Amino acid sequence: MTPRLRRRGALLVSVLASVVLLSSCGGQTAATPHQQQAQAHVDVDTAALRAIKQRAGVEACPTPEGHGPVRGGMPAVTLPCLGGGNPVDLAKLRGPLVVNLFAQWCGPCRAELPYYQKLHEQGRGKVAVLGIDYQDTLPAGALQLAKATGVTYPLLADPTAQLRVPFRVRGLPGVVLVDAHGRVVHEELTEVGSYQQLRQMVQRYLHVAL
């Protein structure tokens, strides 16, 4: 093999390794200035989005009142309700609560959404479920995904990735569990592989049997 061919072969191996590494990432990388500007102008409350939300049957966002931030609780970040509704101060949320970080561009998220919906249905009155559409510039796509997968639990939007630092988000999907006192008792960036896995997580960390 000539030196030129060896160099080409080494370059090809390097490129292929980079492709494999990127394909294994669960989420988007840090946004460029152009992407950040686009994310900052994402409107998550329009007449069209409200119509999609209504057709999908997505419930209204929670309105936590009378609570303040707690040590070890959710971050003091206020997010808009996807498809219209009251914004929510995450620091005021109380559980038992399961928060799902997802996006319409995330393949694994699509697969696990039905498990969260089943938890929403079977855990009604015992544990609440809340979705957060993370770093997503296509809110209509997120609501259409909710409709396609049967999701009806409340959905917030974080198009500018305000939760990147508090939750150390490097990829999606993610799950956060909040107890009755508002404390985050468990968080991980992982795909839930089954409803059984999600149910066991709720029982272990929130002490709620379903």
What feature does the model see in each segment?
Residues S14-S24, P96-L97, Y115, I132-Y134, ...:
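Hydrophobic alpha-helical membrane segments, chiefly transmembrane helices and signal peptide h-regions
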Residues P69-R71, A76-L97:
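A short beta-strand-turn-helix
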Residues P87-R110, Y116, V129:
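Short active-site neighborhood of thiol/selenol oxidoreductases, capturing the structured segment around
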Residues R110-T149, P159-V165:
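Structural microenvironment flanking redox-active thiols in thiol-disulfide oxidoreductases
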Residues Q144-V151, P159-L210:
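Thiol/disulfide oxidoreductase modules built on the thioredoxin-like
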Residues G95, K126-V127, T152-Y153:
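A generic structural signal for alpha->beta connector loops
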Residues M1-P80, L210:
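N-terminal targeting signals for export/organelle localization
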